[in-house]
A protein has these predicted regions:
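ATP-binding N-terminal substructure of ATP-dependent carboxylate-amine bond-forming enzymes
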Residues: 1-45, 50, 54-56, 82-89, ...
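Active-site nucleotide/adenylate-binding loops and adjacent lid/helix of ATP-dependent enzymes
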Residues: 8-12, 52-144, 149-152, 162
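Hydrophobic beta-strand scaffold residues
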Residues: 15, 43-44, 72, 101, ...
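Short glycine-rich anion-binding loops that position phosphate/pyrophosphate groups of nucleotides
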Residues: 21-23, 106-108, 254
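ATP-dependent carboxylate activation and anion-phosphoryl transfer catalytic cores
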Residues: 66-69, 177, 207-316
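Short beta-strand elements
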Residues: 105, 160, 170, 252-255
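Phosphate-binding site of ATP-dependent enzymes
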Residues: 123-219, 242-247
Length: 316
């Protein structure tokens, strides 16, 4: 952090494009750089350090979502505690009853250690706890088990603090062979040499029969944006059950904004060229309500009109 601070003092950027997704080998620390920028009164793209910290833990997100009365699948931690939103049936304590669970890292993103083997069908909760402990022993990171919901997965990208909900995307699993889990694992997300990467595309076109579901997804995305005070850019991930009910999986307050990432795909679908999309994100970072009141707590008299910012630095 000291080296980053020295570089920022030397370059004196008008705005920083924040691309920090992890620090010290863990995504749990991704709020550190935005917090540093706030102390230096330097505007930056994306969500505030407070929002990043609040969403760093997937369990913390789920707990806040439950308190807000929003739907999220039940989950189990390795200490044996069962958590539920009260909106989805779950088995009595001690019995998983053949339910399917997905094993997830608490803090790491980008489908960390997520593959077909992450979907388990357990006879009881003790078996789920054993599976979690194996994951934690292997990786040295905390994991949790979430009830596996349905076969449809949606990503809704959020732009700006208003917020603007970009066109919803659904992951198309139709090309996967029978029996293969309908998930976006590490290979599907990050390894272009794999079958999964090339056979889990996004789609943005929906039938009229899906319109009520799409509207509900947008409503939930806005509610999540307000709940976590999201700004700049963010993404909300959902699964949909057999009854058409959407469930909030994760709130990603720092999604990847590379050209081939889901957020930029949604921006393109909304009519933004890549350069225009970047300019839009910078504009949001330099808007008075963000760069002054939220980022620094006071006005920045040297800030010109957003489009005229000449000195932008990228931190990644």
């Amino acid at each position: 952090l000291a080296a980053v601070r020295r570089r920022l003092l030397r370059t004196r950027p008008d705005v920083v494009f924040n691309r920090v997704e992890s620090l010290g080998g863990s995504d749990a620390m991704m709020a550190a750089i935005p917090l540093l920028l706030e102390t230096m009164q330097i505007p930056y793209t994306g969500c505030s350090s407070e929002a990043l910290a609040a969403t760093a833990s997937k369990l913390g997100v789920k707990e806040q979502v439950v308190r807000a009365g929003l739907p999220t699948p039940p989950w189990l931690t390795s200490d044996g505690r069962v958590h539920t939103s009260g909106q989805m049936p779950h088995r009595r304590s001690g019995s998983a009853g053949g339910e399917k669970f997905i094993l997830k890292s608490v803090f790491e993103h980008s489908s960390f250690q997520l593959g077909d083997e992450s979907i388990i069908e357990a006879a009881d909760l003790a078996a789920v706890k054993r599976a979690l402990r194996r994951c934690e022993t292997k990786t040295g990171r905390p994991f949790f088990a979430e009830q596996f919901v349905g076969k449809r997965e949606f990503n809704l990208s959020i732009l700006g603090s208003q917020p603007e909900v970009l066109p919803p995307a659904e992951i198309d699993f139709s090309a996967l062979p029978p029996g293969k889990p309908h998930i976006v694992g590490r290979e599907a997300k990050c390894d272009a040499s794999t079958f999964e990467f090339h056979h889990t595309p996004r789609r943005f076109d929906f039938s009229p029969a899906d319109q009520l579901l799409i509207n509900r997804l947008k409503e939930l995305a806005v509610e999540c944006s307000r709940l976590f005070d999201l700004r700049g850019y963010a993404r909300i991930d959902f699964r949909c059950d057999a009854h058409g009910q959407p469930w909030i999986l994760e709130v990603n307050s720092n999604p990847c904004v590379s050209p081939n990432a889901g957020f930029m795909a949604a921006m393109e679908r909304a009519g933004y060229e890549f350069d225009d999309a970047l300019a839009r994100l910078l504009d949001d970072a330099l808007s008075p309500g963000i760069s002054s009141a939220v980022r620094t707590g006071k006005s920045r008299s040297r800030r010109a009109e957003p489009r005229k910012a000449q000195n932008a630095a990228a931190v990644k």
